[in-house]
């Protein structure tokens, strides 16, 4: 449903730790999900408030020489496979993204400005909420499509 492929698509990953309020990535579902998306050719922007870029590289078995830790404020250029960002307060991170995947239930992800984010994304833009933390009404009012574990496509 995501244009038939994720190859060369910008996807924003929100959360990498196995649960909120920790930097522990052991057995995190995000590892498998991100590996599979990278293997399919997706371009990932990864944000977790506590997990470092070096930990993500280790978990994904990525050579640091080919990864990029983005500390700049320009998110319009395509990432090189993946980028780690320390903050999502600058909503430019969502520019030209096809989907957002919420993989950890951080409190800050509950308070995102979905209407503003939706304006920056490429339609039909998706939110994949693996933690059931977003407000369904806010997502639909913003024009985004929502998929949840256990619910599938939420209409």
Where are these regions (language model features)?
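Structural/interface elements that position substrates and couple domains in central-metabolism enzymes
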Residues: 1-155
